[in-house]
């Protein structure tokens, strides 16, 4: 799939450069001069995260080291591009996430910090975590575990804590927090299972599970586990519906039934 995604991106870049000569050099430097998705991605991320202390050339060496040691990182990036292309109606081109979407950039940058964290290069991982937060306004701890097929839509203000888990095929909108409940240590953050959609501004706090294909309504505060296929909404959140045919991360349907008809999560 990675090669197919890259071929789509290159073809689009050629057409875009022809149609908008003012951006021809931009499309050349970001896509057309590179041989593969990894090359383009390392160039883009290095330039977005660079500063006077850590120039782009040094960052690119770090990123390419991660790709060479763990090529699956690039495969995950291709899955993420496909997820955004298929789920976001505003995204008409395969190249859009790679070029313009900071949610995608933040996730791919996190994957480098996660590699470094697992290599026990924790100081560098934390340094880059801060740079990601500054550049993209997304704060993902390097130790968090995130799968593939992930979409951070708009992404501004997303926070993912140290012991959080986000499984494959999850969609998360802006302003979401996967956080702890206080000063406790150890395993203290949410576990988000596959196919979940989390609406804008939702807060999920503590070591609780959000079951597969669940939906969290916008601005909800979730303090208790959410069953599979359930929709939870409100402050504090309650179960308002359950549909075993739903695929919320793919459908991206923000609607849910009235919360007055819901039941308390403690039931």
From Swiss-Prot:
One annotated Gene Ontology cellular component of this protein = cytosol
Q: What is its main location?
A: cytoplasm
Q: Which SUPFAM superfamilies match?
A: Trimeric LpxA-like enzymes
Which InterPro entries does its entry note?
Hexapep (IPR001451), Hexapep_transf_CS (IPR018357), LbH_SAT (IPR045304), Ser_AcTrfase_N (IPR010493), Ser_AcTrfase_N_sf (IPR042122), Ser_O-AcTrfase (IPR005881), Serine_acetyltransferase (IPR053376), Trimer_LpxA-like_sf (IPR011004)
What GO biological process, any one, is recorded here? cysteine biosynthetic process from serine
Q: Which reaction does it catalyse?
A: L-serine + acetyl-CoA = O-acetyl-L-serine + CoA
Which family would the database say this protein is a member of?
Belongs to the transferase hexapeptide repeat family.
**Name of the featured protein:** Serine acetyltransferase
Native species of this protein? Haemophilus influenzae (strain ATCC 51907 / DSM 11121 / KW20 / Rd)
Q: Which gene encodes it?
A: cysE
């Amino acid at each position: 799939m990675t090669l197919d995604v890259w071929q789509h991106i290159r073809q689009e870049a050629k057409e875009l450069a022809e149609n908008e000569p003012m951006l021809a050099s931009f499309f050349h430097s970001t896509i057309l001069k590179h041989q593969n998705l990894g090359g383009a991605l390392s160039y883009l991320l290095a330039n977005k995260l660079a500063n006077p202390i850590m120039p782009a050339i040094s960052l690119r060496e770090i990123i390419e080291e991660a790709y060479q040691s763990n090529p699956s990182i690039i495969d995950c990036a291709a899955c993420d591009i496909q997820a955004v292309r298929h789920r976001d109606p505003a995204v008409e081109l395969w190249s859009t996430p790679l070029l313009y979407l900071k949610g995608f950039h933040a996730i791919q940058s996190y994957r480098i910090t996660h590699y470094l964290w697992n290599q026990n290069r924790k100081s560098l991982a934390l340094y880059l975590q801060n740079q990601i937060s500054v550049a993209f306004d997304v704060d993902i701890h390097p130790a968090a575990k995130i799968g593939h097929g992930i979409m951070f839509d708009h992404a501004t203000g997303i926070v993912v804590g140290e012991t959080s888990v986000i499984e494959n095929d999850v969609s998360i909108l802006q302003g979401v927090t996967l956080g702890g409940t206080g000063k406790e240590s150890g395993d203290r953050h949410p576990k988000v299972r596959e196919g979940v959609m989390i609406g804008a501004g939702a807060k999920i706090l503590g070591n609780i599970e959000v079951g597969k294909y669940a939906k969290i309504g916008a601005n909800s505060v979730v303090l208790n586990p959410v069953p599979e296929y359930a929709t939870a909404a409100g402050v504090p959140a309650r179960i308002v519906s359950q549909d075993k045919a739903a695929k919320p991360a793919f459908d991206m349907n923000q609607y849910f039934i009235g919360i007055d008809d819901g039941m308390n999560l403690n039931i």
